[in-house]
A protein has these predicted regions:
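Structured, helix-rich domain cores that form ligand/interaction pockets
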Residues: 1-197, 222-240
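Residue-level recognition of well-ordered secondary-structure positions
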Residues: 23, 136, 206-207, 213
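Short, solvent-exposed alpha-helical "recognition" segments
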Residues: 210-225
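Helix-turn-helix DNA-binding segment
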Residues: 202-210, 241
Length: 241
C-alpha cells in the first residue's frame, strides 16, 4: 500500500509500509533542473550521492538499485539527425522511432533497452549537435550482473569503469549504416538484414554484420563514434578527481 509521496530537487520519495522508494535522476538533482544536457563528471556523481546520503541520513548499503539509466553525451563528426537516421539494429532488435522527438529506441523490455537521441532537440538552449547514447534497465538482475547492487557501489570509482565498458559493449552491438563508404549496396538495404534474421542459419546476421564492418575499414563511422565515446569517458573521469 502506498502511503506518502514527497519530492525534493527532482527526487521523488514514496513511503510504503515495508520500504522507501526513491526515484529520479542524480544528474538532474545535481543541476537542480530537469535536464541532463551538460557534462556530469564521475566525481560530481559521487559527491551528489554522498550529499543525498547526508541530507536524508541514508544507509547507502541498504539502498538497493532496481532501475538504472546511464549514458554519454558526445558531439559527433556528422549532424546528429543523420547519425540517428542510420541507426538500424541493436543486437537483433530494430531501432524504432517514436513520435515525441528525434530519438530511436531498441527493445522495450524491462531487462534492457537502449536509446539514442539528439540532445540538442530536447534542450536546444543548452547544447548543439549533441548525441546521447544510453542504456536503461528496470531489473536488478541486469544491474547486479555489472557487479553493482547498492548506491554505495556508485560512490566507488572502480564501478564506473564497468559502467562505461557496458555502454561501449552495447555500442559494439549496434548496426550503423555508413553510406560515405562505397561497398556493396545490399549492406545498406534494410530488407537484406531482415532476410539475414529470418535465415535458418541463426549466425547469418552477426556474420554479415562482421563482414559489413570489415568492408567499411577501420575509419568507419561506427568506430569513430566509439573512439569519441572513449575520449569523452577519459575526460569525465579525469576532471575534478
Amino acid at each position: 500500500k502506498e502511503l506518502v509521496i514527497k519530492s525534493y530537487k527532482n527526487l521523488y520519495f514514496t513511503k510504503y509500509q515495508d520500504r522507501l522508494e526513491i526515484k529520479g535522476s542524480i544528474h538532474c538533482y545535481f543541476n537542480d533542473e530537469p535536464h541532463n544536457a551538460n557534462d556530469f563528471y564521475i566525481s560530481d556523481c559521487i559527491d551528489t550521492i554522498i550529499e543525498i546520503k547526508t541530507i536524508f541520513n541514508l544507509d547507502l548499503n541498504k539502498c538497493y538499485l532496481i532501475n538504472l539509466e546511464y549514458g554519454i553525451n558526445i558531439k559527433p563528426n556528422i549532424p546528429v539527425p543523420e547519425l540517428i537516421l542510420n541507426l538500424i539494429y541493436h543486437e537483433k532488435r530494430p531501432f524504432n522511432r517514436p513520435r515525441k522527438f528525434d530519438y530511436k529506441i531498441a527493445g522495450n523490455e524491462a531487462y534492457k533497452h537502449v536509446k539514442a537521441y539528439d540532445k540538442s532537440v530536447q534542450f536546444p538552449n543548452l547544447c548543439n549537435n549533441t548525441f546521447r547514447f544510453e542504456v536503461k534497465t528496470k531489473q536488478a538482475k541486469f544491474i547486479n550482473n555489472l557487479g553493482i547492487y547498492t548506491l554505495q557501489n556508485l560512490t566507488e570509482k572502480t564501478h564506473y569503469e564497468t559502467i562505461i565498458n557496458s555502454l561501449l559493449k552495447e555500442w559494439d552491438n549496434v548496426l550503423l549504416f555508413d553510406k560515405s563508404k562505397k561497398i556493396d549496396s545490399k549492406y545498406y538495404n534494410p530488407q537484406f538484414w531482415e532476410e539475414c534474421l529470418m535465415a535458418k542459419n541463426r549466425n547469418k546476421f552477426n556474420n554479415q554484420k562482421k563482414s559489413y564492418y570489415t568492408k567499411l575499414g577501420n575509419d568507419n563511422l561506427h568506430t569513430i563514434i566509439k573512439k569519441t565515446m572513449e575520449r569523452k569517458h577519459k575526460y569525465l573521469k579525469s576532471m575534478h578527481i
